[in-house]
C-alpha cells in the first residue's frame, strides 16, 4: 500500500519549528550550570550578614555534635530530631498553661511510647510480615513473563504462520522529580537563553580534543585502521562544515578557519599532523565552496565610515569584504603549497608534489569559473610560472586551463593579461621554456583580425575630413538635418554596442601582435630551439593574419630553416611548408616568389605519415593539400599536378581507412576542378614521354604522365565499404549520376570531414557492422571418391569376414588387415 502525503502549511510548520527545542550541546549545558551557580550566589549575598554569621555558629555546633554521636556509633539524624523536638516543646510549654499544656504533655508521652515500642515483639512480628510480603512480590515480578509478537512466516503452501515468544518483564524505572529550585531557574533562563549553532561541536572538533591518547604497543594493521577511521571522521566533519557554509555563508564565515587548519601540515588547534588525504579533501572542498558562492562581478571597496548605507546594503558590503578576505587567505595557502616544488630550496617529495598538483588544479578551476573576480590576475600570474615547471601533470593542467579561458573569454581582458605574462616569461628565460608555453597560444580565437587596421583608419579619417569640409559649405537647413541624422546614427551605434566592438577589436589586435612577437623572436634568435615545432605550428595556424610587410622576410627565414637544419623532423618541415603556402595563397599572391623549392620539400615528405603512431599528423598534409591542389591549382603545371596525385594515391595504401577516405576525397575534388587528370585513368603507357620514376624527389621531372592510377584497383577491394565505393567512383571518372555515382550523404563531405567522421580511434566503426543472421548452416553431403574402383567391394568383404568378440560390457569387431594386404 502506498503512503499518503499530507501537506502542511508554512505557518504551522514555522510554529512547530519555533516550539521545538534543539538538543543542548555540552557547551550549552555548562553555560546553564554556570548561570545557576551565579543566581544562587546572588541570593546568598542578598541576605542579612548577621543571620549568615549566626547560621555559621549554629552549623559549627551542630557539626561538632554530629561528629561526637558518630564516634559513639549512634545515628546523628535521629538524635537531632528527638533533641530538637524536646527543645521546641519545652520552649512552647513555657508560654502555655491549663488544658493546652496538658494536651501537649499527653502528645509527648505518646510519641515516647511509640519510639520505645520498637522493641515490642508484636511490632517486630508485623515488620517481619511486611518484609516477607515485599520479598514475595519481588520474586513474582522476576518470574513474570510478557508475550511479544514476532514477524510472521509464510510456509511453502502459502499459509501465514504467526509467532509469539515470552520475555522477562522489566518495569520502567520511575523518574525522579526535579527540584523546584531547578525548575524555577530553568524557567527564568528560558527567556534569556541563546541557542548556539548545533554544528559547533563538529566545527571545533570537540571529539578529537576530548579523546585522550592511549600509550600502548600497536601493530601496522591498527595504524591502518586508525588512519582510515580518522579519514572518515574528517570527511564527515568537512561535509558538515561545507554544508553549513553553502546554506548560509553570511553567518558561517568563521567556519573557513577550521578548513584552513586542515590544509596545514600541522593542525594548529590539535598540534597533530594532518593526513595527506585530509589536506587534499580540505583544499578541494574550499575550492568548490568558492566556486559556488563567489559572485560573477568584481567586488569594489566601499568605505562604510565615510558614507551612510542602508542596512541591507551594509550587510551585503560586510559580507563581500569578509568573503574577499577569506578568498585572499585561501590563495595565500595555495601559493605556499606550490612554492615548495617551484622555488629553489623547496621540499620536493612525492607527497608535496601530489599536494601541489591538487593546488594547481584547484587554481585552474577557480580561474575558469570566475575569470573576472578579484585576485584572479594573481592566480593567472602564478599559473603562468607553473606552466614552465618540471612536472608534466601540472603543465598539462595549466595548458588545458589557459586554452579553456581563451575560448570562453568574451571581454579579452584575462586573455591579454595571460599572453603578456607568457611573453615576459619566454623573454626572461631566453626561449628556454617547455613546449606547453607555446602550444597553449593555439587556443586563441584570432581568426578574423586585420593588422593593417591603423592604415585603414588613417584613410578613413582623411575621407571624413573631406566630408566635413563639404558639410561646412552646406546651407543652414541642410546642416540641421545632417545634425539630427548624426545623433540618430550615434544612438543606433550605442544600441549595437559599436564602441564595445571597437575596444574588443583593439584588444584582439594587441594580442595577435604579442603572439607574433613571441614567434618571430624565437625564429630570429634561436632557430634550433626545442619549441621550434610549436612555433611553426602556430605560424601555420595564424599565417593568414600576418602583416604583409613581414611576408618576404618570413619566407626567407623558413626556407633557411628547411635547407640548413638537417636534423629537422618531418613534422616541422610540413609546418614550414604549410605556413609558406598559406601566406602565398592569401595576400602573398602579390609577392614575386617562386615556390618550386617548397613544392619539392612537400613532395619529399608526403610519404612520412603512415598507419602508425603518426597517423594523426596526416591532418597537416590535408591542410597543405587544400592550399596546393585546390587554391593554387592554376599556378601548377600538368606534370607537377599529376605527380602529386600519383604520390598521394600511393601513400593512401599505407594509411587507415579514414586517412584513405580523406585522400580519395581530395583526389575527387581535384578531378572535379580540372580535366587534366583524366589521362591518369588510361592504362595506355604510350601517352607520356619516358618512364615514371617514383623515387625521384622532383615532381616536375618524374614523368607521372607515363603511368596510371593502378592503386584504385587495390582500393576497390578494401575492407571498408565506403573506401570501395569511393575508389570505384574515381575509377569511373567521378560521375555525378549513373554507374559509379556516390550517395549524396558521402559526396557532399569534404576531405577533413571524411577524416574526422570515419575515425575509429574511439573503437566505433562507421558504418556500423551488421549482426550475422541467425540460422544453422546447410551441410551438403558429398560423394566418396576412390583411387581404385574395386576398393569398395574388397572393403565390404573384409568387414563381412571380421570376427565379433564379446566382452563384459561391449562387443568388438576384429579384422585381419595384414592378410588382406597380402
UniProtKB/Swiss-Prot annotation:
Disordered as annotated region, ranges: 1-86, 106-142, 172-199
One GO CC term on file: nucleolus
Compositionally skewed regions (Acidic residues) per UniProt: 76-86, 181-199
UniProt record, GO biological process: DNA replication initiation
Modification sites for Phosphothreonine: 193
Location in the cell: Nucleus, Nucleolus
Annotated Basic residues bias: 13-23
Keywords: Coiled coil, Nucleus, Phosphoprotein
Source organism, top-level taxon: Eukaryota
Keyword presence, Coiled coil: yes
Locus of motif Nuclear localization signal: 41-48
Transmembrane segments: none
UniProt-recorded Gene Ontology molecular function terms: chromatin binding
Coiled-coil blocks: 445-509
Family named by the database record: Belongs to the CBF/MAK21 family.
Protein name: Nucleolar complex protein 3
Organism this protein belongs to: Drosophila melanogaster
Native organism taxonomy: Eukaryota, Metazoa, Ecdysozoa, Arthropoda, Hexapoda
